[in-house]
């Protein structure tokens, strides 16, 4: 039996909104220590990995491991039926063919119950090895989102170049070109605005703008985004939750793709 209760439905809504435009069919694996999910987009360029730890829930019980295959488009429709401030409980038995979503507004004594049919999704769960990265940076997710949105107006590709002292984003398209340069700094009074950079090797990589536009939708989950880059591995973009994370592994574009 699974019973996973969020104190506010808005958290689960934001989690799903953070990656529902990247992938459609997802297996959620529910275990004693929380819920994990993983999916690859149709082009096999982007891998999404989600972990929601027990501490993220107001109440959590999972007596037996269970996999819930869901269509995120359908799930999102049901999530829109609940208010952000409602509590949300996910309920499923040990061999479910559907999942119950229970929204409760304790102030109004209102209870809304919805059932979503589950799917048998044929997808392997990949073991993600710990990778070595050439450069690691952390910056406000709002700033990264603005950079991506602005530069995507000019080109369908965005280049990220990192040196010891600067982080440069470049777009070069048919209508023109643009660049944004930011530098690492630490604000002791407002640490959430700091930009941190650890560089072992310079990085010069290009990514599809449409994928970056999908990735920045995870910004509603966290004030900051962590980015790890390497010429030998997919880039990692990570938004941390109170307990867990939402990760995007994105393969760079090569010269013959640009």
Swiss-Prot record:
Keywords from UniProt, A to Z, are: DNA damage, DNA repair, DNA replication, DNA-binding, Isopeptide bond, Nucleus, Ubl conjugation
* SUPFAM superfamilies in the cross-refs: DNA clamp
Predominant location: nucleus
Entry PTM: Sumoylated on Lys-164, and to a lesser extent on Lys-127 by the UBC9/SIZ1 complex during S-phase; which impairs ubiquitination and function in DNA repair. Monoubiquitinated on Lys-164 by the UBC2/RAD18 complex upon DNA damage, and then polyubiquitinated through 'Lys-63'-linkage by UBC13/MMS2. Ubiquitination is required for UBC2-mediated DNA repair.
Where does this one sit in the cell? Nucleus
Q: Is this entry keyworded DNA damage?
A: yes
* Signal peptide span: none
Q: Where is this cross-link: Glycyl lysine isopeptide (Lys-Gly) (interchain with G-Cter in SUMO)?
A: 127, 164
Where the record puts its DNA-binding region(s)? Answer: 61-80
Q: Name one GO molecular function term.
A: DNA polymerase processivity factor activity
Q: Where on this protein does the Glycyl lysine isopeptide (Lys-Gly) (interchain with G-Cter in ubiquitin) crosslink form? A: 164
Checking InterPro entries in the record gives: DNA_clamp_sf, Pr_cel_nuc_antig, Pr_cel_nuc_antig_C, Pr_cel_nuc_antig_CS, Pr_cel_nuc_antig_N
User: One GO CC annotation, please?
Assistant: replication fork
Recorded hits in Pfam families, A to Z, give:
PCNA_C, PCNA_N
Q: How does it assemble?
A: Homotrimer. Interacts with RAD30. Interacts with MCM10. Interacts with UBP10.
Hey, which family's this protein in? Belongs to the PCNA family.
Protein name (Swiss-Prot/TrEMBL) = Proliferating cell nuclear antigen
Q: Which gene encodes it?
A: POL30
